[in-house]
Amino acid sequence: MSLRWQAALLDPSLAGGWAVVHCRQQFLVDDSGVLFPRDWLKRLELPLLSEQGLGHFDGEPVFLFELDVPADVPGARWQGLRQFMQQVDPDLFRLLGYATQIGTWVSQHRFCGSCGSPMHARAGERAMYCPACGVQHYPRLSPSMIVLVTRGDELLLARSPRFAPGVYSTLAGYVEPGESVEQCVAREVREEVGVDIHPPQYIASQGWPFPHSLMLGFHAEYAGGEIVPQPEEIEDARWFHIDNLPALPARQSIARYLIELYLARRLGRPEPVLPG
């Protein structure tokens, strides 16, 4: 696994380094990229909500400038995280995904949810602290399952109304309180498409910063039942033969990895590399 990007708790009082600028799920970018000289950004007097030390990219320190409102910077524009997925290398996307999660967490914890007092970053750890009542919050992580259901040479794929036209993907959903991830897999498959599965096999995981999911990937074999798409959640679901697949999710997604991995094992091809 690449070590170009390494998360670390850096002290914002340190000088120099690079910075990414984030606001409302978008990053500032110019013709040179998304990393800006930090000292140059400081001179712009941006509407800074918080500055967070993120870690190191290619050995250089990287910081996050989380803005209160978007700012106009000559020669730069704002761009959403999903666009970067197709444009930058996986290590830089991991950095941006981490920055998104930290920035979202900071912006959503400006005030204490218990007493309403302003919250402050706690020195020495990634935490927001309320000095008035002592409540402490860490970055949020939402565990989610994603599963490829198969029946021999057939893959059960579905599409949400939110997908790009023609794209089908694997099934996914959030883990509910009190259930295991395996229980979540069986429940979500039953809810979304109405079929039963054999016990699922864990494959791999991927951080999914939209804005703070951890995708736990599984494969499950079909056990029985007819496909009945869940109203409002699933626009269409059907079995696809491996020789006649529809448009699939982006290659950087774990959904695509689960599909490509099954095809490789079924057809005796080299296995794909897990996306960062």
From Swiss-Prot:
A divalent metal cation 1 binds at residues 172, 192, 233. InterPro entries: NAD-cap_RNA_hydrolase_NudC (IPR050241), NADH_PPase-like_N (IPR015375), NudC-like_C (IPR049734), NUDIX_hydrolase-like_dom_sf (IPR015797), NUDIX_hydrolase_CS (IPR020084), NUDIX_hydrolase_dom (IPR000086), RNA_Hydrolase_NudC (IPR022925), Znr_NADH_PPase (IPR015376). Divalent metal cations. Mg(2+) or Mn(2+). It catalyses: a 5'-end NAD(+)-phospho-ribonucleoside in mRNA + H2O = a 5'-end phospho-adenosine-phospho-ribonucleoside in mRNA + beta-nicotinamide D-ribonucleotide + 2 H(+); NAD(+) + H2O = beta-nicotinamide D-ribonucleotide + AMP + 2 H(+); NADH + H2O = reduced beta-nicotinamide D-ribonucleotide + AMP + 2 H(+). It comes from Stutzerimonas stutzeri (strain A1501). The keyword Lipoprotein does not apply. This is NAD-capped RNA hydrolase NudC. Homodimer. The gene is nudC.
